[in-house]
From Swiss-Prot:
GO terms for cellular component: cytosol. S-adenosyl 3-(methylsulfanyl)propylamine binds at residues 48, 79, 103, 123, 154-155, 173. Putrescine binds at residues 78, 173-176, 242. InterPro entries: PABS, PABS_CS, SAM-dependent_MTases_sf, Spermi_synthase, Spermi_synthase_euk, Spermidine_synt_N, Spermidine_synt_N_sf. This is Spermidine synthase 2. Residues 17-254 form the PABS domain. Belongs to the spermidine/spermine synthase family. SUPFAM superfamilies: S-adenosyl-L-methionine-dependent methyltransferases. It is an enzyme of class 2 (transferase). One of its GO terms (biological process) is spermidine biosynthetic process.
Length: 308
């Protein structure tokens, strides 16, 4: 998360002239800006600054500590991919844990899978949940599913108390590795995730941008290869309002039944029963699933070198 969020006056001044500019030490020397039509909400939780504004081109925008988390226009590219890449890679997922994801978008997508019987979500910041329900009802609709059980608290602590082998899938929808999300990128956390997964279980975690964060990605890949004895893969998608316009995901499986992440065996786009309550998929399909694992050469060299 952005250090600027700790200086409230500096942060607010960045949106007063009519433009919001996202500035962070994680992407030095550049900024992405959106025109602000109206500021809808400003608050400070126990963990971070929370802002919602109406933009002129991307609809409503949720910002945490100065960093865009989602916009109404392009949230589908992130929420659908971080959810369906893992869940469409295993047969009949039944128990799913979401770490983070307080806006409810991942819940919305998990709830499309009829095989799922239990959806636990652990989000540390209740303000994010409340604000999302108020301003992003089409995203937060996931909370309305009766299979969802909300745990407000620290995801790291929650995982430590989960019985071994509980979940078929864990989805880690974290913000950037600064502030409250820092621990979600570290080795002990991945060890807890692996322990919570059943044999052949899968995890998908937000894994930064290949254009900006190859040093972070390299560390994540190295840690995951030590911990997850099944498969370790990196995929990516395009999200226009994220830094560099792309965001990546680590997809890993535990030892057990083999998981071929690149070839979905549980295609959600072949089943339209979920569209009545959740609407049609806007971004994900089986073709883009497989294509998301194709990496540019510079990233492929770094990621594959960790396999040796």
């Amino acid at each position: 998360m952005e250090e600027q969020g700790n200086n409230e006056s500096a942060y607010i001044s960045s949106i007063l002239p009519g433009w919001f500019s996202e500035i962070s030490p994680l992407w030095p020397g550049e900024a992405h800006s959106l025109k602000v039509e109206k500021i809808l909400f400003q608050g400070k939780s126990d963990y971070q600054n929370v802002v919602v504004f109406q933009s002129s081109t991307y609809g409503k925008v949720l910002v945490l500590d100065g960093v865009i988390q989602l916009t109404e226009r392009d949230e589908c590219a992130y929420q659908e991919m971080i959810t369906h890449l893992p869940l469409c890679s295993i047969p009949n997922p039944k128990k799913v844990l979401v770490i983070g994801g307080g806006d409810g978008g991942v819940l919305r997508e998990v709830s499309r899978h009829s095989s799922v019987e239990q959806i636990d979500i652990c989000e540390i910041d209740k303000m994010v949940i409340d604000v999302s329900k108020q301003f992003f009802p089409n995203v937060a609709i996931g909370y309305e599913d009766p299979r969802v059980k909300l745990h407000v608290g620290d995801g790291v602590a929650f995982l430590k108390n989960v019985p071994e082998g509980t979940y078929d899938a864990v989805i880690v929808d974290s913000s950037d590795p600064i502030g409250p999300a820092q621990e979600l990128f570290e080795k002990p956390f991945f060890e807890s995730v692996a322990r919570a997964l059943c044999p052949g279980g899968v995890v998908c975690t937000q894994a930064e941008s290949i254009w900006l964060h190859m040093h972070i990605i390299e560390d994540i890949v190295s840690n995951c290869r030590q911990i997850f004895k099944g498969s370790v893969n990196y995929a990516w998608t395009t999200v226009p309002t994220y830094p560099s316009g792309v965001i990546g995901f680590m997809l890993c499986s535990t030892e057990g039944p083999a998981v071929d992440f690149k070839n979905p065996i549980n295609p959600i786009d072949a089943d339209d029963s979920h569209t009545k309550t959740r609407g049609p998929l806007k971004f994900y399909n089986s073709e883009i699933h497989s294509a998301s694992f194709c990496l540019p050469s510079f990233a492929k060299r770094v990621i594959e070198s960790n396999a040796k």
